[in-house]
Amino acid sequence: AVITGACERDLQCGKGTCCAVSLWIKSVRVCTPVGTSGEDCHPASHKIPFSGQRMHHTCPCAPNLACVQTSPKKFKCLSKS
């Protein structure tokens, strides 16, 4: 099966996306939108473009947002106010 948006690196994806691990198939990476306000994020996500292979399901937050810890194991993209 051909997976639409499959990628290896960020540079293969368009603006506002990164090449993140698929939620459904861990061996596949897909172009994924950056995190918007209130979405889950990972504090260790690399900036875009990242030259290596990402290990997380989420992309970094959008430029105007920060990845903020909201509970012991949860992080969300929230505005940098």
Curated annotation (Swiss-Prot):
It is found in: Secreted. Its main location: secreted. InterPro entries: Prokineticin, Prokineticin_domain. One of its GO terms (molecular function) is toxin activity. Expressed by the venom gland. Keywords: Disulfide bond, G-protein coupled receptor impairing toxin, Secreted, Toxin. GO terms for cellular component: extracellular region. Disulfide bonds join C7-C19, C13-C31, C18-C59, C41-C67, C61-C77. Pfam families: Prokineticin (PF06607). It comes from the Eukaryota. GO terms for biological process: endothelial cell proliferation. Belongs to the AVIT (prokineticin) family. Negative results: does not inhibit Kv1.1/KCNA1, Kv1.2/KCNA2, Kv1.3/KCNA3, Kv1.4/KCNA4, Kv1.5/KCNA5, Kv2.1/KCNB1, Kv3.4/KCNC4, Kv4.2/KCND2, K2P2.1/KCNK2, Kv11/KCNH, Kv7.1/KCNQ1, Kv7.2/KCNQ2, Kv7.3/KCNQ3, Kir1.1/KCNJ1, Kir2.1/KCNJ2, Kir2.2/KCNJ12, Kir3.1/KCNJ3-Kir3.2/KCNJ6 (GIRK1,2) and Kir3.1/KCNJ3-Kir3.4/KCNJ5 (GIRK1,4). Potent agonist for both PKR1/PROKR1 and PKR2/PROKR2. Potently contracts gastrointestinal (GI) smooth muscle. PANTHER family: DICKKOPF-RELATED PROTEIN 3-LIKE, PROKINETICIN. This is Toxin MIT1. It comes from Dendroaspis polylepis polylepis.
